[in-house]
């Protein structure tokens, strides 16, 4: 019982400490993650944080390939730009080549109603400004009832569960982390559309350290470099 109460207390303390703005990441300029499938490195995910006065652009690049016996079975490449002005979301755009299938999403803010305007390959329309782009670097995602696919604009309603405190070892470094599970709140979704991902954030900095999920294999994102 004491452990349960402690876990709940830690979770709410985490929520209270979440900065309402992305200024929390003002000391981060670059994040790079190693992407693994079944414990084999297959690619990377890189973020660059570019600042100009009160403007922040977060540029992302993801690339991976799956091969067997020297034959390429699957390839994926995506680029995106996430823009903030004075700490608030302003605009997002991405293009993705998913095994030779093109996907995209553009998101802006309605200047009057402040809703998010989504133009994507899977969804077009307005949605709540309480939703967040599904880019895991921003720890505010743990507070949100839904995330917007950074690939296609699909609205993914989610449940977030605090799993507990864990030590995560990557290479020679050990991180003290808070582990969360993200799952789809819509039970009617097909298996390939359901969200079920574990995310680890560093306890004191809220930096994204690791992600893991099962989908035709065991996938992991592991922090490789931060500067």
Feature names for model-found ranges:
Residues 1-4:
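Positively charged n-region of N-terminal signal peptides that target proteins for export
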Residues 6-7, 206:
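General alpha-helical segment detector with a strong preference for membrane-spanning helices
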Residues 7-15:
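Bacterial N-terminal signal peptides
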Residues 15, 126-127, 190:
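Alpha-helical interaction segments
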Residues 21-110, 139-227:
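Acidic, serine/threonine-rich low-complexity disordered tracts
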Residues 94-134:
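Hydrophobic, well-structured mid-protein blocks that either form specific transmembrane helices
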